[in-house]
Amino acid sequence: IKDACEQHYKDIGHDKSNLDVTFENVQARERTQILMDISNKIGGLVVGTGDLSELALGWCTYNGDQMSMYGVNASIPKTLVRGILESYAQHHNELRETLLDICDTPVSPELLPPNEDGTIKQKTEDKIGSYVIHDFILYYMQRHGFGPRKIFDLYINAKTMHEKKMGVENPVIDKADVLKNMEIFYNRFWTQQFKRSCMPDGVKVGSVSLSPRGDWRMASDACQSIWIDELNELKNI
């Protein structure tokens, strides 16, 4: 896609040395355009790669990877994707090395140049926080209707029990970091609904789905202030 993207940067007057959101989204949309056109050419379908966690956070480019002809991962959270790959690798020796390498690679949209040593520069969780926390919130919010305070308490208790099970006698949980991740989740979940309102069809695998034609109908201009206010109260405890 290099030539097509560089031509587009020229067409819209964008300096390609400016590695901003426009630089990234041009690539994401060009990928999608090419896939759509090739699918027409061969009579196929563009299979979406986006998962449930990315849909919840709006971590996708509108009319880029947000769009496909069928979203096979639309109801599978990011943390479960890793678990599925690890489980599949255990039973398929011919793919084990490749799948485990994928699991060990930091999650990234790979839209920015790498570091000088060739390592990934753009790491998703450095930008939007922990998928473990986000998936925990999503499940208890969407499936059970719990608010921030209850989800916070549940997460702290679950994390503490997990640490003890792993041999940590007196685990210390960074509550401020948990609240920071929760704030990111609630802000992004509410402001990114417009991407879910026009998401493509997909399969529902588990008990949680964000399809506007199924389990989740929400106005794109809904306000998250009630949930953020409750989080702010937790910060002051």
Please provide the spans of the model-predicted regions:
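ATP/NTP-dependent adenylation/nucleotidyl-transfer catalytic domains that generate, transfer
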Residues: 1-237
